[in-house]
From Swiss-Prot:
Gene3D superfamilies: GHMP Kinase, N-terminal domain (3.30.230.70). GO terms for molecular function: 3'-5'-RNA exonuclease activity; RNA binding. Its EC number is 3.1.13.-. It is found in: Cytoplasm. This is Exosome complex component Rrp41. InterPro entries: ExoRNase_PH_dom1 (IPR001247), ExoRNase_PH_dom2 (IPR015847), ExoRNase_PH_dom2_sf (IPR036345), PNPase/RNase_PH_dom_sf (IPR027408), Ribosomal_Su5_D2-typ_SF (IPR020568), RNase_PH (IPR050080), Rrp41 (IPR011807). Its main location: cytoplasm. One of its GO terms (biological process) is rRNA catabolic process. It comes from Pyrobaculum islandicum (strain DSM 4184 / JCM 9189 / GEO3).
Length: 246
């Protein structure tokens, strides 16, 4: 493995100045895509994901519909300008197809698809800027976009990442930590139900480090959840003020 250009962890401090259990700055805006039924933009530091939801609506072609539940389709895509790597083909990459499937499976436990028989819900996610943790930022954005669309949900799904960097368990991996760390653990968590919907383990973890990582992921998800709730409330308070006056 290549050495990182800078030390990733020294004297209890990460290369970007954060403590091990500290998220990057989290910014969330709901209702950012005007022609979508629901949308959200989520930034974890420099990583920015925009999600737009269309539906529930009638399934076409009809033979793909299910009589007892709706179908959710998720498309994850990285904008050509989101990374320094040159992207020549608009065709989805193998990684984008895989992450699309992972995100759909992480969102489905939170969505009451039984309320929407013979219907479909389309979720489109665009990564505008990538600096680590893109799939978990996408998960949070997609969950908020579904809520903004008025889709029946059991809980929000909050995505966070935890990793091993120079033997330390750290929260919210940036690009350097994602590239040069010894392990990573993307997590999807429903804070009210206290259930995980996504756990992907990469690297060599001891049992103790893994349990430490799970606890840190829950802490991070609960922090982001408060930001997500505030963003949803802010949008609908603004709408109410526009309708009824201040």
């Amino acid at each position: 493995m290549k050495k990182p250009p800078v030390p990733l962890f020294q004297n209890g401090v990460r290369a970007d100045g954060r403590a091990p259990d500290q998220m990057r700055e989290v910014n969330i805006t709901v209702g950012i895509v005007s022609n979508a039924d629901g949308s959200a933009m989520v930034s974890y530091g420099a990583t920015t994901a925009v999600a737009a939801v269309y539906g529930p609506r009638e399934m076409h072609p009809r033979h793909l519909s299910l009589p007892d539940r709706g179908v959710m389709r998720v498309r994850y895509h990285m904008a050509p300008f989101s990374t320094k790597d040159e992207r020549k083909s608009p065709t989805p990459t193998r990684r984008e197809i895989e992450i699309s499937k992972i995100l759909r499976e992480a969102l489905e436990p939170a969505v009451v698809l039984e309320q929407y028989p013979r219907s479909r819900i389309d979720v489109f996610i665009e990564i505008l800027q990538a600096d680590g943790s893109t799939r978990v930022a996408s998960l949070t954005a997609a969950s908020l976009a579904l809520a903004d669309a008025g889709v029946y949900m059991r809980d929000l799904v909050i995505g966070v990442s935890v990793g091993l960097v120079d033997g330390a368990v750290v929260l919210d991996l940036n690009g350097l930590e994602d590239q040069y760390g010894e392990g990573d653990l993307p997590v999807g968590y429903m804070p009210n139900l206290k259930r995980f919907t996504l756990l992907q383990l990469d690297g060599a973890w001891t049992r103790d480090k893994f349990l430490e990582a799970l606890n840190l992921a829950i802490k991070g998800a609960e922090f982001v959840y408060q930001k997500a709730r505030d963003a949803l409330k802010s949008k609908y308070m603004t709408i109410a003020e526009d309708i009824y006056g201040r």
